[in-house]
């Protein structure tokens, strides 16, 4: 069996108000190739945008990869490496029997992981990590796009 290609992914989410207009950004790096992704929604939360950054990056991969995914969101990292196992066992309910917030995004992230081997890394946000800073800028661009979308819709 051949070795999987290694891709580094850097993600971030942002929200102006929580809830409010939000954006997400991701950088995918494979060797010397790099791709930037961004998007936004007019009414969302920071946690949803953090999830969308990871989902969108993983869904953009065209074949199975070894992924090193860097996020400044403890919510995403802890959720996908720990909490999700209990949620799935409990029918997408928390330990106190409440519905999991953002369950549809967690399910989408779980599905996006399936073809890949992913190592999750937490990086401190706004601490000078170049790729995290760039992902943050892409996320803020996504917020601006979402604001425009909101204003156009009225």
Swiss-Prot record:
Where is Mg(2+) 1 annotated to bind?
12, 50, 72
Entry's EC annotation: 3.1.26.4
Q: Give me the Gene Ontology terms describing cellular component.
A: cytoplasm
Which NCBIfam families did the record assign? Answer: PRK00203.1 (NF001236)
The entry's function note states: Endonuclease that specifically degrades the RNA of RNA-DNA hybrids.
Q: Where is the RNase H type-1 domain?
A: 3-144
Q: Which Gene3D superfamilies match?
A: Ribonuclease H-like superfamily/Ribonuclease H
Q: Give the domain of life.
A: Bacteria
The entry's keywords: Cytoplasm, Endonuclease, Hydrolase, Magnesium, Metal-binding, Nuclease
Q: Which InterPro entries match?
A: RNase_H, RNaseH-like_sf, RNaseH_domain, RNaseH_sf, RNaseHI
- Mention one GO molecular function: nucleic acid binding
Q: Which GO terms describe its biological process?
A: DNA replication, removal of RNA primer
Subunit comment? Monomer.
Q: Which cofactor does it need?
A: Mg(2+)
Q: What family is this?
A: Belongs to the RNase H family.
Q: Which residues bind Mg(2+) 2?
A: 12, 136
Protein's UniProt name:
Ribonuclease H
């Amino acid at each position: 069996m051949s070795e999987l290609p290694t891709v580094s992914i850097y993600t971030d989410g942002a929200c102006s108000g929580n809830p409010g207009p939000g954006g997400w950004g991701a950088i995918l790096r494979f060797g010397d190739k790099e791709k930037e992704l961004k998007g936004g929604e007019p009414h969302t939360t920071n946690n949803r945008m953090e999830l969308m950054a990871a989902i969108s990056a993983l869904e953009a991969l065209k074949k199975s990869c070894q992924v090193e995914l860097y996020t400044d969101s403890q919510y995403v990292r802890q959720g996908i490496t720990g909490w999700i196992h209990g949620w799935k066992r409990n029918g997408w309910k928390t330990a106190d029997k409440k519905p999991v917030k953002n369950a549809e995004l967690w399910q989408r992230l779980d599905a996006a992981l399936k073809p890949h081997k992913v190592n999750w890394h937490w990086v401190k946000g706004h601490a000078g990590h170049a790729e995290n800073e760039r992902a943050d800028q892409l996320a803020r661009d996504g917020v601006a796009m979402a604001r425009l979308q909101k204003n156009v819709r009225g």
